[in-house]
């Protein structure tokens, strides 16, 4: 198998460190991608996971990150407009959300949320986990899907909010809620998927999760190598396995 093109890029100094601020929906995909990149390139990756909105705020305030992998392109464009980035970045994935229901829950894994509506009326639903829509793109899309289904107003008192989509998925599967609206990329990870059942919510029920990444100003060569690596076929194959739609190489 050919090494990714990034193996030699920017590698004149025996490998550097790249600090990657990444949306939490990427957690499991990046746990596979980082070791591959490190082995191929000689660079090291320091990964900081969080909600895109919180990471954006940290970068805007001068946090020393080199690459920003956002779940919502709007945050990348804001940083570009503020002169914090090399360019306007590139689309690296389209994400999806769905309803995750843990084993033993009284809810059905129904992507059209009809059972959720019934459970709200008949009292089966006590708590539903979503990411905080104030700063997590996956939470905002969950809110839009619940609005589309006509459930948002009534379900708000039952919501338990995760700081980011990874925490929302923990709430959704740990028994602290009867279910949750989570990223498909997390539900497809075996360590999450085995905890329950998952059903995709129709993509046209919410704005797209247009995930964009950008190299930040003054980043070292290792940051560019990471960007190149993520556009390689090997990387795209891993992203697809976690349910992401990825641009053609």
Give the location of each predicted region:
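Exported/periplasmic ABC-transporter solute-binding proteins
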Residues: 2-63, 70-73, 77-85, 91-95, ...
């Amino acid at each position: 198998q050919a090494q990714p093109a990034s193996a030699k890029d920017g590698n004149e100094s025996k490998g550097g460190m790249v600090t990657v601020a990444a949306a939490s929906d990427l957690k499991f995909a990046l746990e596979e991608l980082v070791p591959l990149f490190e082995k191929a390139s000689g660079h090291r990756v320091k990964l900081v996971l969080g909600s895109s909105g919180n990471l954006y705020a940290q970068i805007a305030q001068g946090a020393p990150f080199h690459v920003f992998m956002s779940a919502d392109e709007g945050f990348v464009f804001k940083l570009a407009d503020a002169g914090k980035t090399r360019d306007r970045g590139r689309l690296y994935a389209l994400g999806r959300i769905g309803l995750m229901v843990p084993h033993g829950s009284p809810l059905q894994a129904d992507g059209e949320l009809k059972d959720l509506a019934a459970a709200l009326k008949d009292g089966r639903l006590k708590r539903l986990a979503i990411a905080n829509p104030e700063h997590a793109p996956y939470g905002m899309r969950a809110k839009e899907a619940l609005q589309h289904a006509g459930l948002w107003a009534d379900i708000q008192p039952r919501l338990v909010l995760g700081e980011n989509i990874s925490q929302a998925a923990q709430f959704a599967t740990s028994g602290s809620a009867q279910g949750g609206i989570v990223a498909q990329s997390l539900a497809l990870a075996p360590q999450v998927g085995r905890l329950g059942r998952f059903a995709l919510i129709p993509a046209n029920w919410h704005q797209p999760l247009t995930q964009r990444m950008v190299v930040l100003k003054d980043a070292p060569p290792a940051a560019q190598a990471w960007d190149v690596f993520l556009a390689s076929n090997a990387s795209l194959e891993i992203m697809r396995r976690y349910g992401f739609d990825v641009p053609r190489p």
